[in-house]
A protein has these predicted regions:
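Helix-loop boundary and gating motifs at the non-cytosolic
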Residues: 5-60, 228-242
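C-terminal transmembrane helical hairpin of 12-TM major facilitator-type secondary transporters
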Residues: 278-322
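A late C-terminal transmembrane helix in Major Facilitator Superfamily
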Residues: 332-362
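Juxtamembrane intracellular "pre-TM" segments in multi-pass secondary transporters
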Residues: 1-13, 189-221
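Structural signature of the two symmetry-related core transmembrane helices
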Residues: 82-96, 174, 279-294, 370-373
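Hydrophobic core of transmembrane alpha-helices in multi-pass small-molecule transporters
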Residues: 24, 101-119, 222, 303-317
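Cytoplasmic helix-loop-helix junction between adjacent transmembrane helices
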Residues: 108-144
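Helix-to-loop junctions at the C-terminal end of transmembrane segments
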Residues: 65-79, 161, 264-276, 360
């Protein structure tokens, strides 16, 4: 009798552990590629700054179109587990092509199938609702795994790319997706769409207000991601070309920010019900403004590393609370809500990529940091019109 009673708990713990490991592995793959991508495009593919910007814009547009289509399909009848498996398999092949085929035009087609993370978070939310887990902290711990991956990934990426080659780095990312696919296949649950999900209670706003608030939140998160993506694209080149510091410092900065981001994310999740999502997002925006302004004045590695606490507050709240905000505004469409949040990052890449190369060629890297501060100002104004739930 005792054996029977403990079996479901063990199964649930194994499933939860599988979700955490999948989040970590997908995070590692992204953390290996993204920090070094602008250097890869500039040095390996000999792309000009404006072409680097166009790369991020084009790939993000394709990513939005594909992921939004799959999100609608999965909310109606699709099996999210199969979509995650498909995404992992395709990305594995794409990273292998990255390793051997250094062609700029083909590289712009490499991001449209990155639907693994939104679908994984949507599946995790549904699994938590069905099994009675506390949704906020479970989602926060999942997102923290990606942040943990970004502690390890960027320094490892620079070590592999600069110490060995970009080929070794991309093959390592491909291996991560192979392992990820095996875990998804063996341990993640399949949840049918025709079974009603019993969600934890949230405040249900009138449909018109929810749509308006969802649109405003989309603008808020898009502006926040655009500011962050401007920083991500230009920070490695700014550190090397403008400040004449070592290339490994860029990886260390990203890694430290990601490490500090984890406790910030967990603290935000803990206090969310006490102080509300909107106030937390406002704290994130103010922290981001202070961070980008301070980066312009910093000239030494020690100061650059110390400033990452502000970046961690900004990203920890955006990553941990932003997705939950969308899900609570769209409780009946968890997949679409999660993908909509993921697409704010892609819109951020579009905005950042569109202005990045042009502004660098006309002005300087400094102008981009001031632009990032302006974007956060727009986000703050829009946030004030969103109801806190």
């Amino acid at each position: 009798m005792q054996k029977t009673a403990t079996t479901p708990s063990k199964i649930l713990d194994l499933t939860a552990a599988a979700f955490l490991l999948v989040a970590f592995l997908t995070g590692i793959a992204g953390a290996l590629q993204t920090p070094t991508l602008s250097i890869f495009l500039a040095d390996e593919l000999k792309a000009r700054p404006i072409m680097v910007g166009f790369f991020f814009t084009g790939s993000a547009i394709m990513g939005i179109l594909v992921s939004q289509f799959l999100a609608r399909h999965s909310d109606k009848q699709g099996d999210r587990k199969l979509l995650i498996l498909l995404s992992a398999a395709i990305l594995e092949c794409q990273f292998i092509r990255f390793a051997w085929n250094c062609n700029y035009q083909r590289r712009t087609l490499e991001k449209p199938c990155r639907t693994a993370n939104p679908q994984m978070f949507a599946l995790a939310r549904e699994h938590a609702d069905r099994t009675g887990r506390e949704t906020v902290m479970f989602s926060t711990f999942l997102r923290a795994q990606i942040s943990l991956a970004w502690v390890i990934g960027p320094p490892l990426a620079y070590e592999l790319a600069m110490g060995f080659s970009f080929k070794v780095m991309y093959l390592t990312a491909a291996i991560a997706f192979v392992v990820c696919g095996l875990i998804v296949w063996l341990f993640l649950p399949s949840i049918q769409r025709n079974i009603p999900v019993v969600t934890q209670p949230v405040e249900i706003l009138p449909s018109t207000n929810r749509k308006r608030d969802t649109r405003l939140l989309f603008v808020v998160c898009s502006m926040m991601w655009a500011a962050n993506n401007l920083y991500m694209i230009n920070m490695p080149l700014f550190i090397i070309d403008e400040l004449h510091l070592t290339d490994k410092l860029a990886g260390e900065m990203i890694g430290i920010a990601a490490g500090l981001e984890i406790p910030m994310m967990l603290i935000a999740g803990y206090y969310m019900k006490r102080i509300g999502k909107r106030l937390l997002m406002l704290i994130a925006i103010v922290s981001g403004m202070c961070f980008y302004a301070s980066v312009l004045m910093a000239t030494t590695p020690a100061v650059e590393l110390e400033l990452q606490i502000l970046n961690a507050i900004f990203l920890g709240i955006l990553c941990g609370i932003g997705m939950l905000y969308f899900q609570d505004l769209m409780p009946e469409k968890i997949g679409s809500a999660t993908t909509l949040y993921a697409n704010t990052s892609r819109v951020g890449w579009i905005i950042a990529g569109s202005v990045d190369g042009i502004m660098v060629e006309i002005w300087s890297y400094h102008a981009l940091f001031w632009l990032a501060i302006g974007m956060l100002g727009i986000a703050m104004i829009c946030l004030l019109f969103i109801k806190d739930i």
